[in-house]
Amino acid sequence: YAMKRTLVPEILAAYRSLALENDIIVIEGAGSPAEINLHENDIVNMGMAKMAKAPVLLVGDIDRGGVFAQLYGTIALLKEEERAMVKATIVNKFRGDVALLRPGLTMLESLTGKPVAGVLPMLDVDIEDEDSLAARLERRKGDAVLDIAVIRLPHISNFTDFAALEATPGVGVRYVCEASSLGAPDLVILPGTKSTIADLRWLRQSGLEAAVKKLAARGVAVIGICGGYQMLGMRISDAEGAEGGGEIGGMGLLPVETEFANEKHRTRVRGTALETGGILAPLSGAQLEGYEIHMGRTLLSEDATPLVRLENGMPDGCQKGNVYGSYLHGFFDSEGCREAILGALAAQKGVSLQAEPFDLKAYKERQYNLLAKRVRENIEMNMVYRILDAGV
């Protein structure tokens, strides 16, 4: 918290880089712009809007209740120069007849001096949304023929890795945080994490490490992604103190060792799937792409089997029997990759998934188009465009 203001030059550099490439930039705030106890060092709401000299649309979530108090109270608590930057309000996630809201909207406009740009109804669209993460974690699919258990680590990251699996017909994805609820899935996934060592300790203390190892010994496929891959190895060392220092033994399911470093590796990658066995065998020779974001490096033993040969010639990932690990986020987004893995799991189980391929990109496009259509129908877009043209 104390270092937030020191990040401003980096934030401005990122903003200016985006501004060189785009005509319109949408800046999404975080939480409320009227947290008066945090106002002085704000860099994500009105603070960012001031840095970018951006006009503001204030959006209130009516589904949580008290939307008029939210909008009026927020504007009242802003400083005068910030109130002037707010050009209009929007009511989001409304259920019911908008006519019932109109008297309140008229009063809100009178009280704030700001027009209401529209009322967006609650929409049934499948779009990755951090604000609905809790509901997503509890979601169940009644028609699932394949059961995939993702270990819900305390510092789990990159939920988007599993969106493609969640959207695939016939595939059920559960997020598991207790050994007693792990059950007998067809596939266990150890996801990425913002704190590998702390989450490995939690995995051990919760009994989930033992439960996952028991399933692996019975032949259940286990895949680790990024931090999950690191956990599956023999050892993790943190000589530079990236996560507090020290060393910890891994789960011992893959013949690899990880050495942390303070510098984070971030890059988009492409590669070719190597010849392996088990559920990844159908991928041999397939072109894969994704991105890496991790600290340090993972070293394979001499007799280890890598999963992917990257374009730069380096290996990625490792396989031993029915256990697999990789640094590639977005592993399941590739249609061919996902279909091959799910098809192999279905064949092992003796069930069949739908015959028609599931086109994730087309599915996502339909969801975004539906959202755009509803926004155009319910928001006064001409007002929004005028606000954009006028600026602050």
Tell where the protein language model's regions lie, with residue ranges.
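C-terminal lobe/tail of nucleotide-utilizing enzymes
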Residues: 39, 61, 68, 72-174, ...
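Short glycine-/polar-rich loops that comprise or flank the Walker A/P-loop
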Residues: 52-55, 84-86, 249
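Hydrophobic/aromatic ligand-binding patch that stacks against planar heteroaromatic rings
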Residues: 47-48, 108, 214
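Cysteine-nucleophile active-site neighborhood
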Residues: 193-279, 284-289
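Glycine-rich phosphate/ribose-binding loops and adjacent secondary-structure elements
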Residues: 175-187, 195-197, 201-206
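ATP-dependent carboxylate-amine ligase catalytic core
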Residues: 1-51, 62-76, 81-83, 96
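Structural motif
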Residues: 24-26, 57, 90, 189-191, ...
